[in-house]
Amino acid sequence: MATATDRAPHQVQVHTPTTQRVDVPRRGYDVSGGGIKTLLPERGPSTSQIIAVLVGVPTGGTLLLLSGLSLLGTIIGLAIATPVFTFFSPVIVPAVVTIGLAVTGILTAGACGLTGLMSLSWMINFIRQVHGTTVPDQLDSVKRRMADMADYVGQKTKDAGQQIQTKAQDVKRSSS
């Protein structure tokens, strides 16, 4: 078993950081005259940050303007349409309900039909995968099985006929 005295000595090198400077922001009043500068980064923004601001501010401002115009148009339209809706509500509400129910019924019927077609398609594909054959192959297989069955029945009929003939001859011999 190896002990600490059996091993060769290792050398360890220790490097002290001479180029890194750690700034710890101080709280309160700075008497050295640094003031607020100690809280700011030592270098300015990168080029990509400047481009992002130059592109983002006009784009964001334009989108904010468009959303404000959209909100203003909605409020004006609602202010104009509210008296019309109030006046025609006995006609509009039943018409909207009827149209809504009709559209819902048509969409439901279409969804049920589509679901049925998808289910039928899935079943056909599943059956094809289980059997591994197509319809013409299945028909050929059925024809072969029918021919084999006809040969089998014919052979059995011949065998039965021969057995009957043999028994008849045995009976004839035994009676004579």
UniProtKB/Swiss-Prot annotation:
Cellular compartments per GO CC: membrane; monolayer-surrounded lipid storage body
Domain of life: Eukaryota
Region (Disordered): 157-176
GO biological process terms held by the UniProt record: lipid storage; response to freezing; seed oilbody biogenesis
Modified residues (N-acetylalanine): 2
Topology within the bilayer: Multi-pass membrane protein
Subcellular location: Lipid droplet; Membrane
Tissue spec: Expressed in seeds (at protein level). Not expressed in leaves.
Key words, A-Z: Acetylation, Allergen, Lipid droplet, Membrane, Transmembrane, Transmembrane helix
Alphabetical list of Pfam families matching this protein: Oleosin (PF01277)
InterPro entries for the chain: Oleosin
Disulphide-bonded residues: none
Transmembrane portions of the chain: 50-80, 95-117
Family assignment from sequence similarity: Belongs to the oleosin family.
Subunit structure: Homodimer. Forms oligomers.
PANTHER family: OLEOSIN (PTHR33203), OLEOSIN 18.2 KDA (PTHR33203:SF63)
Task of the protein: May have a structural role to stabilize the lipid body during desiccation of the seed by preventing coalescence of the oil. Probably interacts with both lipid and phospholipid moieties of lipid bodies. May also provide recognition signals for specific lipase anchorage in lipolysis during seedling growth.
Protein name: Oleosin Ara h 14.0101
Species in which this protein is naturally found: Arachis hypogaea
Native organism taxonomy: Eukaryota, Viridiplantae, Streptophyta, Embryophyta, Tracheophyta
